[in-house]
């Protein structure tokens, strides 16, 4: 979508949390260190879904602090990247795991505050993926078509604000 002049690198790791006290903190992953070492011009941060699990969300008081730590790390890079924060995708899962009520009523407002505080752009994947449960076979992870819809939403946000 971005063309040959852009080099897109995925440093995502499945099932990771923004919360450093979460069950699988992203900032403890080699991928996080590699993302910083890559010294990108654009950063898209999409975390929060797994933070909504009750055993992670009990540490919600740390969410904004931990997210700010990550934002500051990317802001401090020599490349001074443009940083985008994503609202987590709609979660169609029900039960004791990932909780869309927590995502929509608590995590998204926190991300919104962080974006405003840091003058960052937001990519609203929650709205972009709303009403499309058929694109999430396991009710949480998108299939190929769902990934394309998400990629298009990210692309449109990045290209609109260049």
PLM regions with names:
Residues 2, 77-79, 118:
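Helix C-cap/helix->beta junction micro-motif
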């Amino acid at each position: 979508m971005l063309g040959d002049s852009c080099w897109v690198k995925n440093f995502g790791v499945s099932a990771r949390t923004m919360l450093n006290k979460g069950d699988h903190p992203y900032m403890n992953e080699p991928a996080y260190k590699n993302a910083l070492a890559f010294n990108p011009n654009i950063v898209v941060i999409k975390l929060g879904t797994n933070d909504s699990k009750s055993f992670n969300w009990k540490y919600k008081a740390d969410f904004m602090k931990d997210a700010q730590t990550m934002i500051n790390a990317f802001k401090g890079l020599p490349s001074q990247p443009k940083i985008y924060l994503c609202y987590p995708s709609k979660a169609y899962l029900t039960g004791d795991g990932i909780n869309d009520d927590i995502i929509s009523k608590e995590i998204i407002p926190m991300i919104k505050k962080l974006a405003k505080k840091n003058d960052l752009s937001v990519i609203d994947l929650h709205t972009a993926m709303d009403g499309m449960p058929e694109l999430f076979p396991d009710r949480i992870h998108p299939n190929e078509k769902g990934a394309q819809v998400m990629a298009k939403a990210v692309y449109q946000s990045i290209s609109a604000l260049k």
